[in-house]
């Protein structure tokens, strides 16, 4: 699947990684799986890594459907969700802008986009420089 997620409880963070073609159906499946995951918690921050996408679905009605579905689920949690997008290519920046603009504060989502990994880590308050460092640090603490 071109979208995966990993819950990092020590960071109160859900890391979502897209690769290849970014398709609405894959996103819906991944979000549904996350919503049913026993590790999912209200208020978890989301880091959405779009740096590996090579294409994206352009059916904007379906993209808005995805945002509405996710927004309804997150709004029921009665706490704000920080959605941080990492996008470092023209395509991933377009995808991130589309996703960011699909959220509203009334849905309880604060969405921001960063082009550099160190800026992402700083915004999340993590003492890492890169996403890989964050993932490795989290793995070491589990061992």
Question: For each predicted feature, which ranges?
Answer:
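Amphipathic, Lys/Arg-enriched alpha-helical "gate/interface" segment within cytosolic domains
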Residues: 1-143
């Amino acid at each position: 699947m071109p979208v995966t997620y990993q819950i990092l409880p020590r960071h109160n963070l859900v890391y979502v990684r897209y690769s290849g073609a970014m398709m609405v159906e894959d996103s819906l499946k991944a979000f549904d799986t996350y919503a049913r995951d026993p590790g999912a918690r209200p208020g978890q921050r989301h880091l959405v890594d779009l740096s590996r996408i090579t294409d994206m679905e352009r059916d904007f009605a379906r993209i808005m459907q995805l945002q509405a579905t996710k927004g309804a689920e997150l709004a029921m949690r009665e706490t704000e969700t920080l959605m941080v997008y990492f996008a470092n290519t023209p395509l991933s920046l377009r995808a991130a802008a589309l996703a960011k603009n699909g959220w509203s504060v009334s849905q309880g989502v604060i969405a921001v986009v960063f082009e550099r990994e160190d800026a992402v880590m700083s915004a999340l308050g993590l003492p890492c420089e890169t996403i890989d460092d964050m993932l490795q640090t989290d793995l070491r603490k589990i061992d």
